[in-house]
Amino acid sequence: MEHYLSLFIKSVFIENMALSFFLGMCTFLAVSKKVSTAFGLGVAVIFVLGLSVPVNQLVYSLLKDGAIAEGVDLTFLKFITFIGVIAALVQILEMFLDKFVPALYNALGIYLPLITVNCAIFGAVSFMAQREYNFGESVVYGFGAGLGWMLAIVALAGITEKMKYSDAPKGLKGLGITFIAAGLMAMAFMSFSGIQL
């Protein structure tokens, strides 16, 4: 149990997808203007990561040498299968949001289908394969990585909302000051890097 707790804390804080590995920055910067929209996208990313990492772990275990038949190694197909599973989960999420939460579906706009090619999603799945997590570890890691990404985007959205009323220089208004805020947040999260779990 302690191992899973340390893996969860590590994936949320120490190895944060957005602020430590700088993955998923396109949607991270573009959707961080309002806390409500950022929260909705964060929940969507938690859903996709929480399901795609363990599902891809099961698929990857079938691709390994000798899993299907002796002497058959299909690990060269891992990237295409990872992308296929991620795309299917995002399609399911998109249909669900369109039917049951149309306000969030419209607010996310083009960024919802872009979760399919969000490098944070693919990065977490690739880390799972590289680190050879078992199914339980992949569930914890997927949920933790999604929660960490959501924590980062909601925090940045909160800062961005407050900065609308600040007296920032004209040249830094908008994306410029957002980059600075994201950089300062990343520096703050670097303080977790020395923690050994």
Swiss-Prot record:
Belongs to the NqrDE/RnfAE family. One of its GO terms (molecular function) is oxidoreductase activity, acting on NAD(P)H, quinone or similar compound as acceptor. The chain crosses the membrane at residues 11-31, 35-55, 76-96, 108-128, 139-159, 175-195. PANTHER family: INTEGRAL MEMBRANE PROTEIN OF SOXR-REDUCING COMPLEX, NA(+)-TRANSLOCATING NADH-QUINONE REDUCTASE SUBUNIT E. It catalyses: a ubiquinone + n Na(+)(in) + NADH + H(+) = a ubiquinol + n Na(+)(out) + NAD(+). The keyword Cell inner membrane applies. It is a multi-pass membrane protein. It is found in: Cell inner membrane. Its main location: membrane. GO terms for cellular component: Gram-negative-bacterium-type cell wall; plasma membrane. Its EC number is 7.2.1.1. NQR complex catalyzes the reduction of ubiquinone-1 to ubiquinol by two successive reactions, coupled with the transport of Na(+) ions from the cytoplasm to the periplasm. NqrA to NqrE are probably involved in the second step, the conversion of ubisemiquinone to ubiquinol. The lineage of its organism: Bacteria, Pseudomonadati, Pseudomonadota, Betaproteobacteria, Neisseriales. The gene is nqrE. It comes from the Bacteria. Pfam families: Rnf-Nqr (PF02508). It comes from Neisseria meningitidis serogroup B (strain ATCC BAA-335 / MC58). Composed of six subunits; NqrA, NqrB, NqrC, NqrD, NqrE and NqrF. GO terms for biological process: respiratory electron transport chain; sodium ion transport. InterPro entries: NqrDE/RnfAE (IPR003667), NqrDE/RnfAE_oxidrdctase (IPR050133), NqrE (IPR010967). HAMAP family: NqrE. This is Na(+)-translocating NADH-quinone reductase subunit E. Keywords: Cell inner membrane, Cell membrane, Ion transport, Membrane, NAD, Sodium, Sodium transport, Translocase, Transmembrane, Transmembrane helix, Transport, Ubiquinone.
